A protein has these predicted regions:
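Retroelement integrase C-terminal DNA-binding domain
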Residues: 1-213, 217, 221-222, 424, ...
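A short, polar/acidic, helix/strand-boundary loop motif
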Residues: 273, 602-629
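C-terminal reverse transcriptase regions that engage the nucleic-acid substrate
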Residues: 293-296, 360, 368, 444-565, ...
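Catalytic palm active-site di-aspartate
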Residues: 308-313, 357-367, 391-420, 446-456, ...
């Protein structure tokens, strides 16, 4: 059962102590003995590959957790492929406790899964689940699963009807498992440190156990839910209860060392009925990376003190309220037993199968409305302390201190960044947050950690930002072998070439490729912008990755390995808090003839607060037109930065836009085409003419050699030129 990170098992009904047969999930590769040993199993599961054995379906998760009857599950995605496809037989003896539970639950699994058919279930019925995979017509060979629950009819029981999962429901079920690959393994796309309770206890022992118990104790202390006594449960409540899952995570420091083992109970919000929330605004914003870097540049320029705060169990401080539909959640037996020892109300609610069903009173991670309710809660707290949001980023709030100084905070879910020259009022706000939420950890100093980044403010007038820990974890997790020579640039000259004959990646390789590209994108957008051009191209290849794409990914990894411990430095300098932009384009560089845009925004003299490297949406007829499109698209970003800084109290004069194409600048100055060769250009690309006329931006020509902040993000560059342009971009010595 994917929801418990175990396989789907089949057992011979005549067995006294059930043995099991491993079956194939969806259309993926058949599990091998090696894979079987690597997969996390509930206790010591007995496994027997017996080709002739009659078998029924055993849903381990349903056998121990009576819950919602939903089609958004993966336990029915099974296809009997025969023992001939299994590479090797693996047989293990179950523990006595496992055998007892399996024997007790073996004939109640279907009953628990189909609550509405309880009266029709018989203890000796045989359930056969067949999955017929139909080839989807597109080139990616997506599968649409037709799930048929075929209960062998008896004289007293007719055959049941067929149930069908459409493609969207199947995909939602798969996506709810982080990333469920066809070879029956789970990969997180960005964070690879999440573990199940069993994995965490195996790896970290009592530390993980204490973390899990601490999370449950926090839930009880916060009165997160009301347990429903078993006698008061109705079929509607049982059917509508969503599942829950305890995850354990290694919380890492920016230097790559383990900070702590953190546990979190997560609700399966993907099982909630979204039709009940139609018309409601469930969106929740977080502070943008551009805003954070701009605030750090301001702090460096004005020599502000910087402080971070982390609100523990943030969502639990927000109430679910009574205006919406009640949310019922099922808690698995192992966690239910711990809760029952902490609060007698949970002991009275334990059901025959060991689970507990609760009604959520506080917001829990995973519920579709939790993020919105928490944001409203924390924003109200800030409003009560006279903090006013920035109109262009509501997660940035300010107030004027008694001495006239500005106090600024940025909120990213439960992480808060504070900057001010007035330490007294910064401490007052921090104390108010602690009084409101209780469990708040804070840190201040010349070196602070925020959102996985290490920010060094020890040098007057500058802020240096690195993510050494994430770089190290990417390199460690990569399957790339170190090259024989040092890799001095992240992309070869053929980065945009596509070899249609290159063999495609399958299953695990494709999943690992997708995960690694996602992690690199997160890194490149923040502290390694010189890699962004290569990474942005690979993001277009994740659904159809080939061996050639894997080689391009390997080069980026080797570049990081050979050029580690780098970052960016924000230095506003004498120019002050003013927005500037470097815009460039590489004409016709993609295989479909489209051009590539590179853009870098700065606050003050040097250091990127926002970078972009994207494929243009149209085919242009000349390099001049490509540069015009790049300037038109990127000016949007620059104007947003200007508006943000103005709302922060920094009046903006004309923002400088650096360009290396004189013909493009001439077109913008005239605001129209100047010859037969440019008459076809759409008028929408000339809107920047108005911004020049109103003196919001001024165009300044720069030679290509000193356009590094944008040039390095449009085309592959090597040698001394790359080193020089990388320095111009990152401002890192």
């Amino acid at each position: 059962d994917p929801r418990t990170e175990a396989c789907v098992f089949l057992y011979p009904k005549e067995a006294t102590v059930p043995s099991f047969r491993v079956m194939r999930v969806s259309s993926g590769a058949v599990i091998t003995r090696t894979q079987l040993i690597q997969l996390p199993m509930p206790d010591a599961i007995a496994v027997s590959l017996d080709k002739q054995a009659e078998h029924d379906v055993l849903d381990w998760d349903e056998a121990t957790h009576s819950g919602k009857n939903t089609d958004n599950t993966c336990d029915n995605h099974v296809e009997d492929t025969g023992v001939d496809e299994v590479s090797r037989t693996a047989t293990f003896l179950p523990s006595s406790e496992t055998a007892r539970r399996l024997t007790e639950n073996v004939n109640t699994a279907s009953t628990a899964q189909h609550v509405e058919l309880i009266e029709r279930e018989r203890a000796d019925e045989a359930t056969h689940v067949h999955v017929q995979n139909q080839e989807h017509p597109n080139e990616e060979s997506e599968r649409e699963a037709v799930v048929q629950v075929d209960c062998t009819p008896t004289k007293s029981q007719p055959r049941r009807s067929q149930r069908v999962l459409d493609q969207e429901s199947t995909r939602e079920a798969l996506e709810s498992l982080n990333y469920w690959t066809e070879d029956m393994q789970v990969y997180a796309l960005v964070t690879s440190s999440n573990m199940t309770c069993r994995q965490a206890e195996s790896e970290h022992g009592s530390i993980a156990t204490d973390s899990i118990e601490g999370e449950l104790q926090q839930l009880v202390n916060k009165e997160f839910a009301t347990p429903i006594p078993a006698a008061e449960l109705t079929p509607e409540i049982i059917k509508g209860a969503i599942r829950s899952k305890m995850f354990v995570k290694q919380k890492m420091k920016p230097d790559g060392t383990i900070d702590k083992i953190k546990s979190r109970l997560v609700a399966r919000g993907d099982q909630q009925d979204r039709t009940l929330y139609e018309g409601e605004d469930l969106s929740a914003t977080t502070v943008t990376c551009m805003s954070v870097f701009s605030l750090l540049a301001i702090a460096a320029k004005e020599q502000r003190k910087v402080c971070t705060a982390d609100v523990g169990g943030a969502y639990l401080n927000a109430s679910m309220g009574t205006d919406g539909p009640p949310v019922y959640m099922s808690i698995e037996p192992s966690l239910a037993s711990i809760l029952s020892g902490m609060d007698s109300r949970y002991r009275e609610a334990i059901r025959d199968n060991g689970t507990i069903i609760v009604r959520l009173d506080k917001c829990l991670y995973g519920c579709i409305e939790s993020a919105r309710k928490w944001q409203l809660n924390v924003m109200q707290t800030m409003s009560d302390n006279n903090m006013k949001p920035n109109a262009y980023d509501p997660c940035v709030l300010n107030k004027t201190c008694r001495d006239g100084a500005q106090l600024t905070i940025a909120v990213y879910v439960d992480d808060i960044l504070m900057t001010s020259t007035n330490e007294e009022e910064m401490e007052e706000l921090l104390q108010a947050i602690k009084n409101r939420y209780g469990d708040v950890k804070s840190h201040r100093g010349d070196v602070i950690e925020f959102l996985g980044m290490s920010v060094d403010m020890s040098t007057t007038g500058s802020a240096s930002i690195t993510m050494k820990g994430m770089e190290a974890s990417i390199i460690e997790d990569a399957t790339t072998e170190r090259g024989t020579r040092k890799t001095n640039s992240p992309a070869a000259d053929d980065i945009f070439d596509i070899d249609e004959d290159s063999p495609p990646l399958h299953n695990q390789e494709r999943s690992e490729f997708h995960a690694m590209v996602a992690r690199l994108l997160y890194l490149a957008k923040r502290v390694r912008p010189e890699c962004l051009m290569a990474v942005s191209f690979l993001t277009t290849r994740v659904t159809k990755a080939t061996k050639e794409d894997k080689m391009k990914l390997d080069r980026i990894i080797n570049y990081l390995r050979d050029n580690d411990e780098r970052g960016i430095t924000l230095t506003p300098g004498a120019e002050g808090i003013v927005a500037s932009g470097y815009f460039d384009a590489a004409y016709g560089i993609h295989e479909d003839g489209k051009s590539h845009t590179g853009a870098c925004l700065t606050v003050g003299e040097r250091g990127p607060v926002s970078v972009e490297s994207t494929k243009q949406s149209i085919v242009t007829k000349s390099s001049t037109e490509a540069e015009l499109v790049a300037t038109s698209d990127s000016t949007n970003m620059l104007l947003h930065l200007r508006n943000f800084l103005t709302a922060q109290g920094y009046e903006q004069g004309p923002s400088t836009v650096y360009q290396d194409n004189m013909s493009c600048m001439s077109l913008i100055e005239k605001g129209r085409s100047t010859s037969k060769r440019t008459r076809h250009i759409a008028i929408r690309h000339f809107w920047t003419k108005e911004k020049v006329d109103t003196n919001e931006i001024i165009m300044v020509h720069r030679a290509t050699e000193i356009m590094g902040p944008a040039n390095v993000m449009t085309k592959p560059i090597h040698g001394a030129q790359f080193v020089n342009e990388r320095k111009q971009l990152t401002n890192w010595e």
